Amino acid sequence: MEHFQQVEPFDYVIFGATGDLTMRKLLPALYNRLRMGQIPDDACIIGAARTELDREAYVARARDALERFLPSDILGPGLVERFLARLDYVTLDSSREGPQWDALKSLLAKAQPDRVRVYYFATAPQLYGSICENLNRYELITPTSRVVLEKPIGTNMATATAINDGVGQYFPEKQIYRIDHYLGKETVQNVLALRFANPLMNAAWSGEHIESVQITAVETVGVEGRAAYYDTSGALRDMIQNHLLQVLCLVAMEAPDSLEADAVRNAKLAVLNALRPITDATAATETVRAQYTAGVVDGENVPGYLEELGKPSATETYAAIRAWVDTPRWKNVPFYIRTAKRSGKKVSEIVVTFRPAATTMFGATPASNRLVLRIQPNEGVDLRLNVKNPALDVFNLRTADLDTSIRMEGGLPFPDSYERLLLDAVRGDPVLFIRRDEVEAAWRWVEPILEAWKHDKAPMQTYSAGSYGPEQATQLLASHGDTWHEASE
């Protein structure tokens, strides 16, 4: 088994420790890092939630979560017991004062006062401020404390500002880690390597050579048990305001001075500030929103969004946007962003289409080169090139794909994106986390779109579950001579 560099001893306190995120992602991620030798023996993981449990009952839940969400072949009994031995639990209403905070304080007091302490807020964002207030009241914030904030950071600029102010009152910005798990994905991080470590790509990475960029994240599942939450969010808030805009930033940003956190985040911020505003006047031509209706997904009949929700709604389950980055590098290059529930397939990818070669020596204009960075389900890179069609008597062209799977040495599977990010917070490395001004710049661009939709400037469309979206989304690209990636395969 390959071992990675071990981090220093730490205390990880997870608020919302009985919730789905903790059980499905956080505990399995931490277990995997222990399995790879990165978590020291004296590390402590403390769960905190309102559910009345003792330590034994919480450990039993954690064991069930590991067995449910991880492959059985990596659950060695000795490793599982070593991991569970690091767990503790406190019954705690994080929004209120009370003696249960003293119980948490007692657990943390067992360690040296200068030990790294990470508070992970896997709770509703409206609780972030009160949790920080209580951490301060009970003197649990130390110079080596960090706080990890899950999305969404607000539902608009006002609520995002309130959340950031509430946390910032007690934690300086350098101790705040706003997590976006997309930035923990290997293919997303590889955007920087492909661009800046390969002169072949770097020289062609501008509007002079690139015709369009598509950023897609669609899935086959519906809202299912999250209907009440999702109806207050929608596709634009849930995916584009955070994950997909971050991906766009990595594709479009100028080369940072270094890979230091602020250098990278400054470069991303410049992209967000350069996004052309979408207003009431342009929403109809630059955006499409839609809801799925009943259809067939993976051979099964599924209900429409309104049927699942059980009431009328103006919340979109599909969003497509044609964005423009108003910098010299990206003049006249459209960035197409889309996300959807109940799509015909599950895929997240970046598609870069290059301008065709300006030559007629082969009789017809060669097909455009196309670079596809697959984020999920199978991470990898495809590059479509023009090659000679094998024949003895003619010199015709055909396209051929160079397909590269990005694999770890030794054939190990990629770590889940949370695995890297959880330990980056321990290391104090914020490069893959979001700075406050990035969050607010993203909201400045997204909020006018939400307002335009609220005023019905881009009418709500529909699409059948199991399809690739409404016809209007196809027209969004066709008006610029483009097609969505799956239509060209």
Curated annotation (Swiss-Prot):
The keyword Oxidoreductase applies. This is Glucose-6-phosphate 1-dehydrogenase. Pathway: Carbohydrate degradation; pentose phosphate pathway; D-ribulose 5-phosphate from D-glucose 6-phosphate (oxidative stage): step 1/3. The active site is at H243 (proton acceptor). The keyword Oxidoreductase applies. GO terms for molecular function: glucose-6-phosphate dehydrogenase activity; NADP binding. NADP(+) binds at R50, K151. NCBIfam families: zwf. Belongs to the glucose-6-phosphate dehydrogenase family. It catalyses: D-glucose 6-phosphate + NADP(+) = 6-phospho-D-glucono-1,5-lactone + NADPH + H(+). One of its GO terms (cellular component) is cytosol. SUPFAM superfamilies: Glyceraldehyde-3-phosphate dehydrogenase-like, C-terminal domain, NAD(P)-binding Rossmann-fold domains. InterPro entries: G6P_DH, G6P_DH_AS, G6P_DH_C, G6P_DH_NAD-bd, NAD(P)-bd_dom_sf. One of its GO terms (biological process) is pentose-phosphate shunt, oxidative branch. Catalyzes the oxidation of glucose 6-phosphate to 6-phosphogluconolactone. Homodimer. It holds the Pfam family G6PD_N. Substrate binds at H181, K185, E219, D238, K341, K346. Keywords: Carbohydrate metabolism, Glucose metabolism, NADP, Oxidoreductase. Its EC number is 1.1.1.49.
